[in-house]
Swiss-Prot record:
HAMAP family: NqrF. Belongs to the NqrF family. NQR complex catalyzes the reduction of ubiquinone-1 to ubiquinol by two successive reactions, coupled with the transport of Na(+) ions from the cytoplasm to the periplasm. The first step is catalyzed by NqrF, which accepts electrons from NADH and reduces ubiquinone-1 to ubisemiquinone by a one-electron transfer pathway. It is found in: Cell inner membrane. It comes from Vibrio alginolyticus. Keywords: 2Fe-2S, Cell inner membrane, Cell membrane, FAD, Flavoprotein, Ion transport, Iron, Iron-sulfur, Membrane, Metal-binding, NAD, Sodium, Sodium transport, Translocase, Transmembrane, Transmembrane helix, Transport, Ubiquinone. This is Na(+)-translocating NADH-quinone reductase subunit F. Its EC number is 7.2.1.1. [2Fe-2S] cluster binds at residues 69, 75, 78, 110. The lineage of its organism: Bacteria, Pseudomonadati, Pseudomonadota, Gammaproteobacteria, Vibrionales. It is a single-pass membrane protein. PROSITE patterns: 2FE2S_FER_2, FAD_FR.
Length: 407
């Protein structure tokens, strides 16, 4: 009898707890539809279910806000202005938003929970962002760890981007084995040296990342990206490799790939100032886009130079492109510096790190380096070194433009 009574009491306690939870849920979790008012325009209003994040609700309604980290709160790009209904700003957002901006309603859409009706404000250019399913034209190695992914836009469509802009690319859940990569013989030495073929990328959910475009607006119907494979660092070889780069490197001719865009803010200023471009690694992409746009589309007569840093001759690419532009335009010159040239390179050009080469061979004797505009994109250490050098020369922040892809 005691056992039966104990079972009955336990069951009653469990039922009571369930009822308490259900009651609390009914009070704390909103039910029914909620409305997101956008830019005070009734035609843009979004009706959705509560729960989830604002970024996802906007995407579900076909409004694609830039989010290079895929909604993780780390990139700080998905800024919107929440005028009401967003709740208190979270500590994760304050890493990217100042207290003053927070008072004005600035929020990260990926961190705003959908609990009640909301009134938000979005930049008008957001409504020009679209999504396309593209076809892979080619995906070739341009350097040991860099591929050029070339995508075909669907017939009759176009991506109305500006030079220096970027798109977001989607990777589905996947299992990629590096051993299946087709690495050309000239690049295999380092892959085998660092035992990279042992890696695999196993991902169970969709991922979104941002990449700057290497093509310029008059290269119609295509999107070109320079993608560096994100392998684990040598001092920590057991961490997982990069999700998106692993997926992109697995793509083959004819495969389908979903992108959205265009996005961007790394645009050239409309001035007559001298332009100095500084790049390294996959930071080549926006450099190529900008320089081609200035010289081929705009026929700019501004004085400009391009300084690119590579490890060895094997890591140089688009050489023929820039040689052609230099031959055709008296106002453009370009230089490459190798930090670790190989004996077989027979290199007689600049050597060392690109910030030192730029300073020693040009800016040190420049009559007014502070008057130039500097456009740069490369690995974080390169960016920091170049910016430090420019600051020492008295260059103001407004003349230093950085496409900071974080690596």
């Amino acid at each position: 009898m005691d056992i039966i009574l104990g079972v009955v009491m336990f069951t009653l306690i469990v039922l009571a707890l369930v009822l308490v939870i259900l009651f609390a849920k009914s009070k704390l979790v909103p039910t029914g539809d909620i409305t997101i008012s956008v830019n005070d325009d009734p035609s843009l209003a979004i009706v959705t279910q509560p729960g989830g994040k604002l970024l996802s609700a906007l995407a579900g309604a076909g409004v694609f806000v830039s989010s290079a980290c895929g909604g993780g709160g780390s990139c700080g790009q998905c800024r919107v202005k929440v005028k009401s209904g967003g709740g208190d700003i979270l500590p994760t957002e304050l890493d990217h938003i100042t207290k003053g901006e927070a008072r004005e309603g600035e929020r990260l859409a990926c961190q705003v929970a959908m609990k009640t009706d909301m009134d938000i404000e979005l930049p008008e250019e957001i409504f020009g962002v679209k999504k396309w399913e593209c076809t892979v034209i080619s995906n070739d190695n341009k350097a040991t760890f860099i591929k050029e992914l070339k995508l075909q836009i669907p017939d009759g469509e176009s991506v109305p981007f500006r030079a220096g802009g970027y798109i977001q690319i989607e990777a589905p859940a996947h299992h990629v084995k590096y051993a299946d990569y087709d690495i050309p013989e000239e690049y295999r030495e380092d892959w085998e040296k660092f035992n990279l073929f042992r890696y695999e990328s196993k991902v169970n959910e969709e991922t979104i990342r941002a990449y700057s475009m290497a093509n310029y607006p008059e290269e119609h119907g295509i999107i070109m990206l320079n993608v560096r494979i994100a392998t684990p660092p040598p001092n920590n070889p057991d961490v997982p490799p990069g999700i998106m780069s692993s997926y992109i490197w697995s793509l083959k001719e004819g495969d389908k790939c979903t992108i959205s865009g265009p996005f961007g803010e790394f645009f050239a200023k409309d001035t007559d100032a001298e332009m100095v471009f500084v790049g390294g690694g996959a930071g080549m992409a926006p450099m190529r886009s900008h320089i081609f746009d200035q010289l081929k589309r705009l026929h700019s007569k501004r004085k400009m130079s391009f300084w690119y840093g590579a490890r060895s001759k094997r890591e140089m690419f688009y050489v023929e492109d820039f040689d052609m532009l230099q031959a055709e335009n008296d106002n453009f010159v370009w230089h490459c510096a190798l930090s670790d040239p190989l004996p077989e390179d027979n290199w007689d050009g600049y050597t060392g790190f690109i910030h030192n080469v730029l300073y020693e061979n040009y800016l040190r004797d420049h009559e007014a380096p502070e008057d130039c505009e500097y456009y740069m994109c490369g690995p974080p250490m390169m960016n920091a070194a170049v910016i430090g050098m420019l600051k020492d020369l008295g260059v103001e922040d407004e003349n230093i433009l950085l496409d900071d892809f974080g690596g």
